């Protein structure tokens, strides 16, 4: 009986270890759990001249993956966001891991994706997009802009865009938390109407850190 429990615990520890991100590695394939889908980008986020890494990785827990009649698989696992910073040793070192802030797919007809990018200035952009294959003509996306400062990552802005595929109506609401300004731009991609822009002041608030709120498409 003791041997059984020892083997069971050892197998559990091995499985748990296989699902962990490595603390250091050379690239995303080296540090992520085997079999996880990923979208990774490289860039200098902390201004030290070294190339860092930001990645969105989706687990492959089979209990949360369904296969449709056409053979396509829907993955309902919650994605994980990881940020690695490059060290003097040339390796990537885990800076932060965020397990619960990204949106997971909840319906077969609604696809939710989070795509990372890094700007030339080193800002991290996380774009959350929603596409409904039925029930809605509107496609929406929200871009969150983050900046590394004071040894952490802070949200400095957000762009919310919506497009009605049937009418061409488009609206983009851009918020800059550094200047406390909001710009709403409305246009029509079909009628090619002149864009209308409306500025608004936002209340001054302390910047939120990455991880302090969920990244949703709103």
Label every PLM stretch briefly.
Residues 28-53:
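N-terminal targeting signals for Sec/Tat export/insertion, comprising classic cleavable signal peptides
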